[in-house]
Amino acid sequence: MHREPPKKKAEKRLFDASSFGKDLLAGGVAAAVSKTAVAPIERVKLLLQVQASSKQISPEARYKGMVDCLVRIPREQGFFSFWRGNLANVIRYFPTQALNFAFKDKYKQLFMSGVNKEKQFWRWFLANLASGGAAGATSLCVVYPLDFARTRLGVDIGKGPEERQFKGLGDCIMKIAKSDGIAGLYQGFGVSVQGIIVYRASYFGAYDTVKGLLPKPKKTPFLVSFFIAQVVTTCSGILSYPFDTVRRRMMMQSGEAKRQYKGTLDCFVKIYQHEGINSFFRGAFSNVLRGTGGALVLVLYDKIKEFFHIDIGGR
């Protein structure tokens, strides 16, 4: 008779709206700050990834690498074009990262209930991986159209409004939806789910696992947390980068009368056959630098949760 109240209390905690809302706020604020800081590198990375599929960039005008891209963007499009699409990126990234973090902690409660880290280490480790992957996949289903629009806006290289393909976020979504329907906004969704599970599983799972092995995970020094986060984001980014390249290429097809790829597998095969394996990792170094922003998100998220006095369960 006396076991029922604790059970109800546990159920209440599992679906605590207040805690969930604070998770959204903490993750969103941390993400907005970090993405604005690394926006120029983000745009360079996108251009290097998709220039072979862009009709706006002729073969002879393609960027030779990160440095060439960094030099030519301000010269050809203006200095502030480094932040082109950044507002859309912040709008997209707020719900994406916030939902990732919020769902991650909820999935951790579901997957790790009753798991003892000391006695069931591998089950605990796999639960961390599963919670990270499930959080990323769930969030992607909700915000994919915004991610799609962010990509198309980021690789739009016209100098003035008359040369641009899209006027802004709303214009991009409306034009693609009008020409291809809602399905056009989900171009590349399948490979995105595969890539996001690989990335998020290692991103969240490895970070939480390594921090959990420290003597006092809740009192980890900032520099130690940042170093762990930096290593995790770099490894996760490289591991999932080929999936990201293919999904970006698939996104470039929406709204086009003639399509370059028949599907995800065809895209993988054609990139390998016509451009070589290195093309799957084009812009990867920029992504490593951009990963600094991802590392900051992880660390800032923990600090913001501490500020709001949110219990970081399992850490």
Swiss-Prot record:
The lineage of its organism: Eukaryota, Metazoa, Chordata, Craniata, Vertebrata. Belongs to the mitochondrial carrier (TC 2.A.29) family. It holds the Pfam family Mito_carr. It is a multi-pass membrane protein. Gene3D superfamilies: Mitochondrial carrier domain. InterPro entries: ADT_euk_type, Mit_carrier, Mitochondrial_sb/sol_carrier, Mt_carrier_dom_sf. This is ADP/ATP translocase 4. Keywords: Antiport, Cell membrane, Cell projection, Cilium, Differentiation, Flagellum, Membrane, Mitochondrion, Mitochondrion inner membrane, Repeat, Spermatogenesis, Transmembrane, Transmembrane helix, Transport. The gene is SLC25A31.
